[in-house]
A protein has these predicted regions:
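Bergerat-fold GHKL ATPase/HATPase_c domain
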Residues: 1-63, 67, 71-85
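Conserved beta-strand-loop-beta-strand hairpin that lines the nucleotide-binding pocket
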Residues: 7, 70-193
Length: 193
């Protein structure tokens, strides 16, 4: 399902900086644009038949993931500021995609853990430890919240950053990705039950 959206986001995140489409419906240059679009999502999903509780759960998860794009890149965007945000639901299968062309998980977490080895270790740490690059703030639980809800609700999550990919469902598998992602790319899939 939604292979067109997945192809579109991979193109958006890997295209040369001067060729990135920042005029499209899926581009959110600022947090307020992202939040306004995300706030509309639950009602749109419910109108298409998604269970209310699942609609609001994936809304909360998308909010966490999308806000991370802005929180961890503020003042540090290497090229294109903002995030790609898209969602779709066909009455049975749903997808939410969030991507940013920011510093990525490894470079973000190295602010708190300078000796972090590679993208694989960074993803492992991000999903399992209470850690944040914003070391003076009490943060670092967002991806644990996402991971817990993916597992509890039989959702599927793919998270790409650098040369690493985390696949989450009831278990988490971290591997080297065929696709290099400068920044982060998240694909969340869900089904109405």
């Amino acid at each position: 399902m939604n292979t067109d959206l997945e192809k579109l986001v991979f193109k958006w995140i890997t295209t040369e900086t001067n060729k990135v489409d920042v005029s499209g419906d899926f581009y959110c240059q600022t947090r307020d644009v992202f939040e306004a679009r995300n706030d509309k999502m639950p009602e749109e999903l419910i109108k298409k038949g998604l269970d209310d509780s699942l609609a609001y759960l994936v809304y909360a998860m998308a909010g966490e993931l999308g806000n991370n794009a802005f929180d961890h890149n503020v003042g540090n965007w290497p090229n294109i500021m903002g995030a790609f945000y898209a969602f779709d639901y066909d009455g049975k299968d749903g997808i939410i995609i969030i991507a940013d062309r920011g510093v990525g998980v490894l470079n973000s977490l190295r602010k708190a853990v300078p000796d972090l080895k590679d993208d694989l270790d960074a993803l492992e740490m991000a999903f399992t430890k209470k850690i944040s690059s914003r070391v003076l703030e009490n943060r670092g639980n967002g991806l644990k919240f996402v991971r817990g809800n993916v597992s509890k609700n039989n959702l599927l999550l793919e998270f790409f950053s650098g040369n690493a990919k985390a696949d989450l469902n009831h278990e988490m598998k971290i591997s080297v990705s065929d696709q290099i992602v400068a920044g982060c790319l998240v694909i969340l899939k869900f089904q109405n039950i």
